[in-house]
Amino acid sequence: KGERPTIVFGPSTRGQGDQCAPSRAGMQLGSVGLSKVGSPTINASYEYSFYMMALRHGARVIVADLIGLGMPGHHTYVNHIEEAHALLDAARSGLELAHAPKDAPIGFAGYSQGGGASLSAAEYAERYAPDLNVAGTYAGAPPTDLPETMRSIDGSAIAHVLGYAINGFSERSPEFRDAVLAELNPRGIDFLHSAATS
């Protein structure tokens, strides 16, 4: 009963290259293609079954490309302010596009990076988007303790996310970039370049 709810999904980590934007996979299980440097890519839509389940239950579904995915610049992995703004702006745009009432209930959902984005959207909603009627949030496994996250993934199969974070913060803060670059050897610089297109 009541106004149709809208669920804004924050996507899980897929990669930092533009080919990893959720909009590049569309509302499909995923897509395959080539990166800017010509290597093969797969964009897997991990959350696809959740989108479909929400739609089947009558919710309006919005899947946000986080800032820097599918557009110029580096994707801002674990930049919680930018992730919050991306989801909150997507909620506003989605309601407007659907001609939905401004007070329609909004929920945020995501896991891992998407969990961090969802948690941040809920946290910043009152300040950044007080016009939205945020009714609920699911934030699964958000990477909120960055030092602990770094320790747990360093040397693992998902270590590239460290490069995503460094690339994103380096683009936004010249001081941070200069401090990091002063500590990197050529192998470290190659790692950051590789992360930027993966």
What are the language-model segments listed below?
Residues R56, Y77-A98:
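Alpha/beta-hydrolase active-site loop
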Residues G68-T76:
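Glycine-rich "HGGG/HGxG" loop immediately N-terminal to the catalytic nucleophile
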Residues G2-R56:
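Short, surface-exposed "cap/lid" segments of acyl-processing enzymes
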Residues T13, D65-L69:
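Short beta-to-alpha linker loops that shape the active-site pocket of alpha/beta-hydrolase fold enzymes
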Residues E3, P40-E47, T76-A84, Y111, ...:
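Solvent-exposed, acidic/flexible segments
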Residues P143-S198:
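Accessory cap/linker subdomain of secreted extracellular hydrolases
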Residues R92-H160:
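Primarily recognizes the serine-hydrolase "nucleophile elbow" in alpha/beta-hydrolase
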